[in-house]
Amino acid sequence: MQILTWALAALAAIPAVTAAPVETVEASSMDELVERSPNVTLVARGTPSSTGTHNGFYYSHWTDNAGADVTYSMGGGGQFSYTWRNSGNFVGGKGWNPGNAGRVINYSGSYSPQGNSYLAVYGWTRNPLIEYYVVESFGSYNPSSGATNRGSFTSDGSTYDILVSTRYNQPSIDGTKTFQQFWSVRRNKRASGTVTFANHVNAWRNAGLNLGNQWNYQILAVEGYHSSGSASMTVR
């Protein structure tokens, strides 16, 4: 296995996008570093996809490695940060595994995209395989313009548009598959608030969109696609 070099910065340090000194550690994976150093801020630059647990939360970081200049860091509890520049496609954040239909998700932070990006509650189910997004904010591209509209509903102080799209032979939690995406897109963008996820599950069901009965991970996520930006978020 190829040995990767990762950087670890102390919790009290300024995030690694500054010139603050860091300790360099050799490890074969992000998971190994989390196990060896659970109480530090983890920073990963241009890293391969990885999942695991950190400070009591599940995390996921996926990238297509298409020239990605992406820095992903994790702090205490549910805190995580991204900075990216001229990235390929990436998505990641912190949350839970498995997810569930009744979770109330609280989050706060800052989100500053330049180009195509989403801030969303994000996850997967199986049987059937479904990728879902509750988009709380986005950059230059509104996903509601590229999917089939199934109506709208009100939750947590805003109207959300319901959408569905199909991805053909694309990456998934089960490898390359064809699957549907369910979307709720908030009209009033925000970077802090509460998502009552059951409201979205019910609205999707009423629109004929049924999630699978096997829950995989469920996270607050930042996604970027050939864009730049920064985000620092905490999920609770």
Swiss-Prot record:
It is found in: Secreted. Pfam families: Glyco_hydro_11. It catalyses: Endohydrolysis of (1->4)-beta-D-xylosidic linkages in xylans. The active site is at E131, E223. The keyword Secreted applies. Glycans are attached at N39, N106. One of its GO terms (molecular function) is endo-1,4-beta-xylanase activity. Its EC number is 3.2.1.8. GO terms for cellular component: extracellular region. Gene3D superfamilies: 2.60.120.180. Residues 1-45 form the signal peptide. Endo-1,4-beta-xylanase involved in the hydrolysis of xylan, a major structural heterogeneous polysaccharide found in plant biomass representing the second most abundant polysaccharide in the biosphere, after cellulose. This is Endo-1,4-beta-xylanase 3.
